[in-house]
């Protein structure tokens, strides 16, 4: 089975986007410091409710068979009016810890597919590695990308998604775990 077929037919997007809704409506997550916990929870939800295996390696986040998948996600990635088939620029690689240029990143294959998820519009698109790398642009502190119609395959998620949220807030569970951890 191909990655796209699996994402379209064997992935429970109602639960994945339910996790997203729960995390972004969680009043206990209010600062940028919470972004890591949110991103990790979404990655783990994708792994639990799809055929992808979360590996969290440098340059890719999942595997699907022998294919490496890099995940990029964010709110409001696709334009709502200007061009609904185009994304705003978003960061794909960071220069902060490395002395690399955009050209270095264009030459370096680390994944087979980039999976881009717009958390607000509930859209999932797949970009092949070689094409993605050809679109890298220089940003303030890393390589950026901007996608247009023809740059990606958009997964058919079956129309309007009715979400199923987890029964508890993750921030509450984390706080209880920390309290228990410190109870010695």
What are these regions (language model features)?
Residues 1-184:
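Nucleic-acid endonuclease domains
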């Amino acid at each position: 089975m191909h990655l796209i077929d699996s994402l379209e037919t064997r992935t429970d997007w109602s639960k994945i986007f339910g996790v997203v809704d729960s995390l972004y409506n969680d009043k206990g997550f209010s600062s940028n410091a919470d972004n890591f916990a949110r991103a990790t929870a979404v990655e783990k939800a994708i792994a639990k409710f799809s055929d992808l295996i979360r590996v969290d390696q440098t340059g890719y986040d999942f595997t699907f068979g022998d294919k490496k998948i890099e995940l990029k996600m964010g709110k409001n990635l696709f334009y709502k009016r200007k061009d609904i088939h185009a994304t705003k620029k978003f960061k794909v690689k960071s220069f902060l810890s490395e002395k690399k240029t955009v050209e270095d990143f264009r030459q370096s294959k680390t994944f087979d597919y980039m999976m881009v998820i717009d958390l607000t519009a509930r859209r999932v698109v797949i970009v092949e590695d070689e094409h993605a790398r050809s679109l890298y642009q220089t940003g303030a502190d890393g390589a950026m990308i901007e996608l247009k119609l023809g740059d990606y395959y958009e997964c058919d998620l079956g129309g309007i998604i009715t979400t199923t949220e987890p029964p508890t807030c993750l921030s509450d569970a984390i706080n209880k775990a920390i309290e228990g951890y410190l109870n010695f």
